[in-house]
Amino acid sequence: MPKQVVIPPGTGKPLAPYVPGTLADGVLYVSGTLPLDAEANVVHVGDAAAQTRHVLETIKGVVEAAGGTMDDVTFNHVFLADWADYAAINAVYAEYFPGEKPARYCIQCGLVKPEARVEIAAIAHIGR
């Protein structure tokens, strides 16, 4: 199966030369997703929970555009700007993965947009 680019309708312009998702051999790779609007402005500044919800809704859109659901997500890379947001981010994260949880790692680091509190990248196995 050839590589397929996945760009959901209404997706804004990326900050760099990448696409929201790439599907290859049934595996969807979702790029690092920041809490951005269509003009690449950070939304919900200062609210880690709202930013996490925005990020996960964006990821959900990419997964669905590839023909999957959030149940198909098998791995997440979670990047936090501040460990103080860990509990708030986890509370929202748990809403999107209520049953079987995907594997993940979580690290604190600087993000490309200083107002962003969280960035998440994902891997999903579509049609498993």
From Swiss-Prot:
Highest taxon listed in the record's lineage: Bacteria
Keyword Cell membrane: no
UniProt-listed SUPFAM superfamilies: YjgF-like
Keyword set includes Hydrolase: yes
GO MF annotation: an example: deaminase activity
Reactions this protein catalyses: (Z)-3-aminoacrylate + H2O + H(+) = 3-oxopropanoate + NH4(+)
EC number(s) given by UniProt: 3.5.-.-
Class of enzymatic activity (EC top level): hydrolase
Keywords of this entry: Hydrolase
Pfam family, one: Ribonuc_L-PSP
GO biological process: nitrogen utilization; uracil catabolic process
GO cellular component term of the entry, any: cytosol
InterPro entries: RutC, RutC-like_sf, YjgF/YER057c/UK114
NCBIfam families tied to this protein: RutC (TIGR03610)
Family stated for the protein in its record: Belongs to the RutC family.
Cited function: Involved in pyrimidine catabolism. Catalyzes the deamination of 3-aminoacrylate to malonic semialdehyde, a reaction that can also occur spontaneously. RutC may facilitate the reaction and modulate the metabolic fitness, rather than catalyzing essential functions.
Protein name: 3-aminoacrylate deaminase RutC
